[in-house]
Swiss-Prot record:
The active site is at H63, D105. One of its GO terms (biological process) is lipid catabolic process. It is an enzyme of class 3 (hydrolase). Inhibited by EDTA and bromophenacyl bromide (BPB). One of its GO terms (cellular component) is extracellular region. Keywords: Antibiotic, Antimicrobial, Blood coagulation cascade inhibiting toxin, Calcium, Disulfide bond, Hemostasis impairing toxin, Hydrolase, Hypotensive agent, Lipid degradation, Lipid metabolism, Metal-binding, Platelet aggregation inhibiting toxin, Secreted, Signal, Toxin. Disulfide bonds join C42-C131, C44-C60, C59-C111, C65-C138, C66-C104, C73-C97, C91-C102. Belongs to the phospholipase A2 family. Group II subfamily. D49 sub-subfamily. Its EC number is 3.1.1.4. This is Acidic phospholipase A2 BthA-1. It comes from the Eukaryota. InterPro entries: PLipase_A2, PLipase_A2_Asp_AS, PLipase_A2_dom, PLipase_A2_dom_sf, PLipase_A2_His_AS.
């Protein structure tokens, strides 16, 4: 529950990428889609360790890796430009760093949609204690 509260504070208090990522998830997955990914498996939510639990959690693992490769701006707080088109997201803007953040979020959101059948409620609030295996490299 603490993780949910932390994420809620972050999403409400930030008008940057995490806020936009949540809005993007809701657009693609449905109005409350973001709640499903606040604390799921070993990688969805704050932090991440161990092996992804399933294809849905792997989306978050890849997203974490993508954020880790961003240089020159802060993926968690910097705002970017995107538009919505026929259920998809199109990243825009002139700043290459911010566009890279948007692409990380877009790819993850699309991954959630493409793997929604792998989502398993048993991994919601799974907990770090269940994610003790060695992490694979990005």
């Amino acid at each position: 529950m603490r993780t949910l509260w932390i994420m809620a504070v972050l999403l409400v208090g930030v008008e940057g990428s995490l806020w936009q990522f949540g809005k993007m998830i809701n657009y693609v997955m449905g109005e409350s889609g973001v709640l499903q990914y606040l604390s799921y498996g070993c990688y969805c939510g704050l932090g991440g360790q161990g092996q992804p639990t399933d294809a849905t959690d792997r989306c978050c693992f890849v997203h974490d890796c993508c954020y880790g490769k961003v240089t020159g701006c802060d993926p968690k707080i910097d705002s970017y430009t995107y538009s919505k088109k026929n259920g998809d997201v199109v990243c825009g803007g002139d700043d290459p760093c911010k566009k890279q953040i948007c692409e990380c979020d877009r790819v993850a959101t699309t991954c959630f949609r493409d793997n929604k059948d792998t989502y398993d409620i048993k991994y919601w609030f799974y907990g770090a204690k269940n994610c003790q295996e060695k992490s694979e490299p990005c």
